[in-house]
Swiss-Prot record:
It comes from Arabidopsis thaliana. This is WD repeat-containing protein GTS1. Involved in the control of plant growth development. Acts as negative regulator of seed germination, cell division in meristematic regions, plant growth and overall biomass accumulation. May function by regulating ribosome activities and biogenesis in plant cells. The keyword Signal does not apply. PANTHER family: WD REPEAT-CONTAINING PROTEIN 89 (PTHR22889:SF0). Expressed in germinating seeds, rosettes leaves, flowers and siliques. Transmembrane segments: none annotated.
């Protein structure tokens, strides 16, 4: 069936989140449209933008990646080739040389690159030893390294010739869920794992565990996501699989705040159902940080985080409700220069298989109005065990 999407006019609203917004000014957002990506038990894992925001890529539990217009929801095509769960996707950050290239890693042990103009695979790196790849990052002092987080290992390749240059296997004892090169120090690589450790490596020279592991942060519980924060990217936020939130200085290993009851603090900060899980953190630049929490019924809130000791989580400053009916897996907020003209806030995807596009809407009576496109990628129902997307 041909994929189509409804287009409708939306009002332009102020969409800037502020860490000082009073509770009475909480912004609620209404649906622009909703795209059903599949029938059955298939669902959305991750949504990422092309660098110029002319497309968004969406990874699905069908082991495929589909591309859409972030403004109209128009379907562009799909990248198909992985034989197991797609764990991470990202567009190339090189706006001049390869803005159309999309990268993906999978539990099938490969990292693949796709030309999103033709939707064809253009490169493939294979671990060759039944490894799963849970995360990847491009960087290095010469911008030639590709790091992959695997089972108990961090692998590094020279992506220019697909040659493996290092296997760091003594630093972690469990699945490596995250790898990130530091944006302004591309020779520095951070890895995070189910073992509760965040490791800092220097990737210059002949890379090995003994000489290039610079420091270790012990978070103490299984790590789900990490990300950079603050001027100079010196801080690191960390979300764990038991829904705790902590902020660290990765350079000296100090913990600025550890919110062990972050989910309870967020639940107490709004009038919706209890926050059941955290989706991600939002850091648009500078020192401001929001943690994005959701309910099992599909409502999502942006909660401002005060990470000065003793730390606190404030009243939700944005609420996305009425679009999903199950756990939300990914939230993608559009920058004002790309979504503002159309009054768009961003996109969400979840375990209900829906992609929801959100518009600003100050009128509370409009919050639950939605415009639903035709069913997309119609497939016959099939019996399939629904597995949570998990690194372990």
């Amino acid at each position: 069936m041909e994929e189509v999407s409804s287009e409708m006019e939306v009002e332009v609203q102020n969409r800037q989140l502020s860490d000082s917004s009073p509770a009475q000014n909480v912004k609620k957002f209404g649906l622009k449209n909703s795209i059903q990506t599949n029938f059955g038990s298939d669902y959305v894992f991750q949504i990422v933008p092309k660098i110029d925001w002319t497309a968004i890529a969406v990874s699905l539990s069908t082991n495929t990646v589909k591309l859409y217009s972030p403004v109209t929801g128009q379907y562009y095509g799909e990248c198909k080739g992985h034989s197991d769960t797609v764990n991470q996707i990202a567009f190339s950050s090189d706006s001049a040389a390869s803005p159309h290239v999309l990268h993906s890693c999978s539990s099938d042990g490969t990292i693949r690159s796709w030309d999103t103009r033709s939707f064809q695979q253009v490169s493939r790196i294979d671990t060759g030893n039944d490894q799963e790849i849970f995360s990847f990052s491009y960087g290095g002092a010469a911008d030639n390294l590709l790091a992959g987080g695997c089972k108990e290992q961090v692998l590094l390749w020279d992506w220019r010739n697909s040659k493996q240059v290092a296997c760091l296997e003594e630093s972690h004892m469990d699945d490596v869920t995250q790898v990130h090169f530091v944006p302004n120090k591309p020779n520095k690589l951070l890895s995070a794992s189910v073992d509760g450790l965040i490791c800092l490596f220097n990737t210059e020279g002949d890379i090995n565990d003994d000489d290039h592991l610079e420091s270790v942060i012990n978070v103490g519980t299984s790590i789900g996501k990490i990300g950079f924060l603050g001027d100079g990217y010196k801080k690191l936020w960390c979300l764990t699989h038991i829904e705790t939130l902590s902020i660290w200085n990765w350079e000296d290993g100090s913990c600025e705040v550890n919110l062990e009851k972050a989910r309870e603090l967020a639940s107490d900060s709004w009038t919706q159902d209890n926050v059941d899980y955290f989706v991600d953190c939002h850091c648009p630049g500078g020192e401001d940080l929001w943690v994005i929490g959701g309910t099992c019924a599909g409502t999502v809130g942006y909660f401002p985080v005060n990470y000065k000791q003793p730390g606190s989580i404030g009243t939700a400053e944005a609420i996305l409700g009425g679009g999903h009916i199950d756990v939300v897996r990914s939230v993608l907020q559009m920058p004002g220069e790309y979504g503002g003209a159309a009054g768009l806030f961003g996109w969400t995807g979840g375990e209900d298989g829906r992609l929801c596009c959100w518009k600003s809407d100050e009128d509370a009576t409009e919050i639950n109005r939605s415009w639903t496109s035709s069913e997309l990628v119609v497939k016959p129902p099939r019996n399939r065990k629904k597995n949570r997307h998990s690194p372990y």
